């Protein structure tokens, strides 16, 4: 166990530290998604690893003699959870969970959605807007760029009420509009 008040790592580091192809892929993802460091990427990979492990466990339980009713219940719990976060479609199966990619997980981060919805010009600017408190979900300020946005919350992303960016004539808003992002 351990001391419950002490935080523990939420990710696992790669086993081969200097594998060239992995390093190149990580660098590309960090640049594309505007991640601060590799730790953020490793966290996303660890979350996906847990989902895949749950799906593999379901497959093993199914072949091990679990009743159809229990299997369907557990499968629906897993798929509904992933559907709520927008990682799989509504009619997904265990195979879809096993086929998840880290890019799908990174696409659900608040930082990425702020950029894609046109609130910022670049991933770095999206991160800055979030950490400085200019972005809100359902009217509540969110200052965590790695916040996983649920499917229902996606339409509720906006500028935070007291933020100067809510004003349409703000210079940065006009730059964003001129850039053709929004």
Swiss-Prot record:
Pfam families: S4. The keyword Ribosomal protein applies. One of its GO terms (molecular function) is structural constituent of ribosome. GO terms for cellular component: small ribosomal subunit. Keywords: Ribonucleoprotein, Ribosomal protein, RNA-binding, rRNA-binding. GO terms for biological process: ribosomal small subunit biogenesis; translation. CDD domains: S4 (cd00165). PROSITE patterns: RIBOSOMAL_S4, S4. Residues 108-172 form the S4 RNA-binding domain. The keyword Cell membrane does not apply. Part of the 30S ribosomal subunit. Contacts protein S5. The interaction surface between S4 and S5 is involved in control of translational fidelity. One of the primary rRNA binding proteins, it binds directly to 16S rRNA where it nucleates assembly of the body of the 30S subunit. Belongs to the universal ribosomal protein uS4 family. This is Small ribosomal subunit protein uS4. It comes from Methanoculleus marisnigri (strain ATCC 35101 / DSM 1498 / JR1).
């Amino acid at each position: 166990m351990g001391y419950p008040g002490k935080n523990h790592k939420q990710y696992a580091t790669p086993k081969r530290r200097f594998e060239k192809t992995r390093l190149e892929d990580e660098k590309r993802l960090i640049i594309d998604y505007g991640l601060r460091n590799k730790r953020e990427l490793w966290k996303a990979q660890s979350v996906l690893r847990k989902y895949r492990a749950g799906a593999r466990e379901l497959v093993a339980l199914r072949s091990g003699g679990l009743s159809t009713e229990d299997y369907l219940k557990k499968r629906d719990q897993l798929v509904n959870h992933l559907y709520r976060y927008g990682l799989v479609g509504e009619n997904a199966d265990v195979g879809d969970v096993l086929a998840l990619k880290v890019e799908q997980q990174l696409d659900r981060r608040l930082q990425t959605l702020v950029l894609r919805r046109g609130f910022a010009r670049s991933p770095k600017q999206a991160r800055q807007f979030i950490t400085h408190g200019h972005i809100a979900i359902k009217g509540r300020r969110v200052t965590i760029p790695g916040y996983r946005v649920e499917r229902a919350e996606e339409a509720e992303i906006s500028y935070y009420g007291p933020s100067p960016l809510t004003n349409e004539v703000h210079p940065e808003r006009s730059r964003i509009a001129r850039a053709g992002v929004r």
